Regions:
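Short, well-ordered beta-strand elements within core beta-sheets of diverse protein domains
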Residues: 37, 54-61, 150-151, 260-261, ...
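Short loop/edge segments at beta-strand edges and connector loops
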Residues: 209, 230, 351-353, 416
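ALDH superfamily catalytic-core signature
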Residues: 6, 10-16, 20, 34-40, ...
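Structural signal for hydrophobic packing residues in well-ordered secondary-structure cores
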Residues: 56, 60, 75-78, 82, ...
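N-terminal Rossmann-like NAD(P)+-binding subdomain of aldehyde/semialdehyde dehydrogenases
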Residues: 2-138, 513-543, 548-550
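Residue-level signal for inorganic ion chemistry
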Residues: 63, 67, 109, 173, ...
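Conserved C-terminal structural/oligomerization subdomain of aldehyde/semialdehyde dehydrogenase
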Residues: 32-39, 356, 363-550
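Rossmann-like NAD(P) dinucleotide-binding subdomain of oxidoreductase/dehydrogenase enzymes
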Residues: 128-269, 393
Length: 550
């Protein structure tokens, strides 16, 4: 009979495997890895974890300058032949891979080379803000690595996302275990080959098997931090495993990203950006547009332009040959179900079609829906398929109210005049807001990226992403001789503390000055009590000594 605690652990493990295989909308169901028995897999992962811990101790002792030198060498090797590394990514469009994965990865690497020394240096805290009663206290903030960081990678950007996260982790002095998405080990193996040639010591970065069991096993053996890019369902399952050991994590999860079209927006620009966002990487991008909030006038004009441009793009693609289909049909099937529900509730499907030839509904093409409402499931789901819903609103305030009905708050886009868009962007609850463009500006390596709500927590990339890879240690040095808290209590202590509070926190300098005489009197009384106590104790000790003398 299985004990209740053991049974619960087994069920959690099953849940994680299920989420990593099926509920994570950015992983393929098939896997190229060799199936390893769970016991053997656990032993193999344990060996990798121990090797990572040993490597981390030595790696963290290397000066930061030396670590960054290796990163620079790696960057230059990739730049010398970027097509070779791009060819290892399972994507037909090499130009898109170079633009969406290789170039941002190199930019992030150079950002670390130039900024990591500033970000990771020990900082002496200034005296400003120090309480008066703690004069003489000095504080140094020292960044230290976590230890071993587990990175669970996605399949939509299998090189860029885990690659940047791994580089940030090792820059901070951690070692890294990467669990690749299914069929994505090859590109990361290529990256690690280059890293080894650049001088990265063995076991500082290691690849785990693609099996979800590998991630589960290493989490149960308590890594020091987990960075996950995946669906909200995967994040929920992983969080349960991490809860027992209170392992910290960063989770970049699902999006249902919104586009806000203000009245003074350029409809031509909006339609161009929507077409780009819907078709980039087959719409398998967490920041892809899914909801458009616009007035009737703007919606009509944008829909007219967007449909014409989409039709032109489809004719162009047809003339150039068949477009490769992604192997994972699950996102298309889920999208088809959500679209059908929306149509039955009054939405209109303007482009794309649903095919039922295989017995199950499946979306084909880009689906543009009009007359969608925020309570429809299609506007509240983390779809990983080219689906765009137009939600018509009468005001900016209504747009924000409708937007808030969705639990996903990863990123958003605003179109309008610069000043008005800047003001409106500050009212949006999202981790990142882009103005008058879409997705591409977020490749800037300075920009931190992270979601809120069901879209995750913590940050990746930029300075904030690097700081996620360290834990701060505060080193506090006290004054050498004045430590009144070590004295024995006296009846005057409360008076002294009261006047100290009045002195430091009075409503004006005048009232602070009024507290000074009272503070002096209370302090003198305190000193008098202590002096009298010392004399009394001394007299008693002398008397006892005389009584003991024969």
């Amino acid at each position: 009979m299985i004990e209740p605690a053991r049974l619960e652990s087994v069920e959690i493990s099953r849940a994680v495997r299920l989420r990593l295989h099926t509920a994570d909308s950015i992983e393929h169901p098939a896997s190229a890895h060799v199936v390893v028995p769970p016991c053997a897999l656990t032993e193999a992962v344990s060996s990798q974890l121990h090797a990572a811990r040993r490597a981390q101790v030595e790696w963290s002792s290397h000066p930061l300058k030396q670590r960054l030198k290796i990163l620079k060498s790696l960057r230059q090797m990739i730049a010398a032949d970027p097509r070779w590394l791009a060819s290892t990514v399972d994507r037909d469009n090499v130009a898109e891979t170079l633009a969406a994965e290789i170039l941002p990865l190199l930019d992030a690497c150079r950002f670390l080379e130039s900024e990591a020394t500033r970000i990771l240096r020990e900082k002496q805290v200034g005296n400003r803000g120090r309480p008066m009663w703690l004069w003489g206290t000095s504080v140094v903030l020292r960044p230290e690595p976590f230890g071993v960081v587990l990175i669970i990678g996605p399949s939509n950007y299998p090189l860029l996302l885990p690659g940047i996260q791994a580089l940030q982790a090792i820059t901070a002095g951690n070692s890294v275990l990467i669990k690749p998405a299914a069929n994505c080990s090859g590109t990361l193996e290529a990256l690690l080959q280059l890293a080894a040639r650049a001088g990265l010591p063995s076991s500082v970065i290691q690849l785990l098997p693609e099996s979800p069991d590998a991630a589960t096993a290493v989490m149960q053996q308590q890594v020091d931090k987990v960075v996950l890019t995946g669906s909200a369902a995967t994040g929920e399952a992983v969080s349960r495993v991490l809860a027992d050991a209170t392992t910290p994590s960063v989770m970049e999860l699902s999006g249902c990203d919104a586009v806000f079209v203000l009245e003074d927006a350029d409809s031509e620009l909006v339609s161009n950006c929507l077409l780009f966002g819907l078709t980039l990487n087959g719409s398998r991008t967490c920041m892809a547009p899914r909801r458009v909030f616009a007035s009737d006038h703007q919606a009509d004009e944008i829909l007219r332009l967007l449909q014409a441009k989409l039709a032109r793009r489809e004719r162009q693609d047809a003339a150039e040959g068949p477009v490769a289909e992604f192997r994972d049909a699950r996102p298309s099937k889920l999208a088809a179900l959500k679209i059908r529900e929306a149509i039955s509730s009054g939405a209109a499907m303007l482009t794309g079609f649903i095919d039922t030839a295989n017995g199950q509904p499946e979306l084909h093409g880009v689906a543009i829906l009009d007359r969608v409402t925020s309570d429809m499931s299609v506007a509240q789901s983390d779809l990983f398929a080219p689906v765009l819903s137009f939600i018509r609103v009468g005001s900016e305030t209504q747009a924000l109210q409708e937007y808030a009905k969705c639990p996903f708050t990863l990123s958003a886009t605003v179109f309008g005049s610069p000043q008005r868009s800047q003001q409106f962007a500050r009212r949006i609850d999202a981790g990142c807001v882009v103005i008058n463009d879409m997705i591409v500006p977020t490749a800037d390596p300075r920009i931190p990226f992270g979601g809120r709500g069901l879209s995750g927590h913590g940050m990746t990339r930029g300075e904030a992403g690097l700081l996620e890879m360290i834990q701060l240690k505060a080193i506090v040095a006290s004054r050498r001789w004045f430590k009144p808290h070590l004295h024995s209590p006296t009846p005057a202590d409360a008076d002294v503390m009261e006047q100290l509070i009045r002195l430091e926190h009075a409503r004006s300098p005048f009232h602070s000055l009024k507290s000074i005489p009272r503070m002096i009197r209370a302090t003198l009384a305190q000193m008098s009590f202590r002096r009298n106590r010392t004399l009394t104790i001394g007299s008693k000790d002398s008397l006892n000594s005389e009584l003991r003398t024969p």
